[in-house]
Design a protein with these regions (language model features):
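Specific aromatic-rich, kink-prone transmembrane helix
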Residues: 123, 150, 162-180, 185-193, ...
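Membrane-interface alpha helices of multi-pass inner-membrane proteins
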Residues: 184-201, 206-211, 233-234, 415
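Transmembrane-helix motifs of polytopic, lipid-linked glycan transferases
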Residues: 111-131, 169
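Short acidic/glycine- and proline-prone juxtamembrane loop motifs at membrane-interface regions
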Residues: 155-160
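Perimembrane helix-loop-helix junctions
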Residues: 2-5, 11, 176, 205-237
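Transmembrane-helix signature of polytopic, membrane-embedded enzymes
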Residues: 124-146, 164
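Membrane-lumen/periplasm interface segments of specific transmembrane helices
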Residues: 33, 37, 226-327
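Short hydrophobic/aromatic helix or loop-helix immediately within or flanking a transmembrane segment
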Residues: 71-102
Length: 429
């Protein structure tokens, strides 16, 4: 006869195995949808929206990649600022080369970005599961996967989904080691940060999550947590590698201030930023809302094919109520916010769950503030890396409300389904 404690352990083990299987299936489904979506976007000529450099990253599928990285070329530029994406693509194309008998190199490259996006979905599921019951984590993971920024950039060739996925992996890793710190966990977290900073140096803002979390939980005792300071050194190390080694390679040295180095790039873009009400409004609507849900079925406004620009959404939130589908989505989102405000109660799902909201908010705010100063016009490119933080800031208080469990699950399921359909219409055009 199995003892009660042994039976409980067996049940717990079965639960964890089932969770791993479910999360893997969701990630696999995301990969399939993203890869199929990439073909739909090509068919409707929709791969160059939101200032994406798809036309440039598509060259990563062609042979002799590093031989084509010549001085003052666009390939040299993306290698200088996003070397992880370039090296990842080069390695991937070598690995899948035997599959060119059935797929074109372009299709195989699209599969890479779809797989990277799916890995981010898998990471998001574990991030939600670290703070919420599995039924909520699963639904919020589907919402993350269906969000427009994640879906779109997983379906085209762009470095931004690599950064978003590394951000999700970082968040999931930290949330899971938060209550059980280990040296190996800290090393893994630092490795993710280093790779993320190599792909986009602004990923350094991820350090705000453990740093602010330590301050919130331990206040001045946090200064004794030496590992966070050592962990943060991954960012300047990555910058030194980018500026001192990669930029020092003659083939990638640039001269224009827009791309000569990271500092001149920041100053060049920031000097062109206009701080007006319209710019703030457009930035916030895109960063917070368009990144999650498409406000209209097409994004052809201000399109200019001569410069590989497929257009953006018309600035403004009123387009959400122009169709019954998006209007219903808005109504569900409003209901979710109303539940959070009206039925809120003390967050006690897991110990210290409420405390993580401040670090997540700190990361989301610093990333948004930087890109508002740096490049507000192209903010749709950079918002997917904040998607998980934004959704966690909604998921945690919503799970803690006094709304009945069945009603919570129903509302989230409807929201996930409508978001998938709404953004799916945009993908297929």
């Amino acid at each position: 006869m199995v003892s009660p404690s042994r039976h409980a352990l067996l049940q717990l083990g079965a639960y964890h195995r089932a969770t791993k299987l479910i999360f893997f299936i969701v990630a696999l489904a995301a990969f399939a949808f993203y890869w199929l979506s990439s073909f739909a976007l090509v068919a409707r000529n929709g791969t160059q929206h939101f200032h994406a450099d798809t036309w440039l990253y598509a060259e990563l599928s062609e042979p002799n990649l590093f031989d084509r990285i010549l001085p003052n070329t666009q390939l040299a530029r993306i290698f200088r600022f996003h070397p992880v994406t370039v090296v990842l693509a080069a390695g991937w194309m070598k690995i899948v080369n035997p599959l060119t008998a059935w797929f074109t190199p372009a299709q195989l490259l699209k599969a890479l970005f779809a797989a990277v996006g799916a890995l981010g979905v898998w990471a998001s599921l574990w991030a939600f599961a670290a703070l919420l019951p599995r039924r909520y984590a699963l639904l919020w993971g589907v919402i993350y996967a269906s969000s427009l920024g994640i879906w779109y950039f997983s379906s085209i060739e762009e470095s931004k989904i690599v950064t978003a996925t590394l951000s999700a992996l970082y968040s999931a890793t930290y949330l899971r080691m938060r209550e059980n710190w280990t040296r190996s966990g800290a090393v893994l977290l630092t490795a993710i940060l280093f790779i993320a900073c190599l792909n986009e140096i602004v990923a350094v803002f991820l350090v705000a999550i453990p740093a602010v979390d330590a301050l919130v939980q331990a206040r001045w005792e946090a200064l004794k947590r030496w590992w966070i300071a050592a962990h943060a050194m991954a960012a300047p190390l990555a910058l030194a590698l980018l500026e001192g080694v990669i930029r020092g390679w003659g083939a990638v040295a640039g001269s224009h201030p827009e791309g000569a180095n990271h500092f001149s790039m920041f100053l060049w873009y920031a000097s062109h930023t206009q701080f007006t009400f319209n710019s703030v409004y457009y930035f916030l609507t895109t960063w917070l809302f368009f990144n999650i849900a498409a406000p209209e079925r097409h994004a052809y406004h201000w399109a200019n094919p001569s410069i590989h620009f497929g257009g953006i959404f018309m600035p403004g939130l009123t387009n959400y109520v122009a169709s019954p589908l998006s209007a219903a989505l808005v109504a569900l989102f409003a209901a979710l916010l109303a539940v959070i405000v009206a039925l809120r109660k003390k967050i006690a799902i897991l110990p210290n769950v409420a405390a993580i909201m401040i670090p997540l908010l700190a990361y989301a705010f610093t990333r948004a503030a930087f890109f508002f100063v740096f490049n507000p016009k192209e903010n749709m490119l950079f918002s997917p890396s904040a998607t998980l933080a934004h959704l966690l800031l909604l998921a945690i208080p919503f799970a803690a409300t006094s709304l009945p469990e069945r009603a919570k699950v129903t509302l989230l399921a409807l929201l996930a389904a409508l978001l998938f359909v709404n953004n799916g219409f945009f993908i297929i055009g």
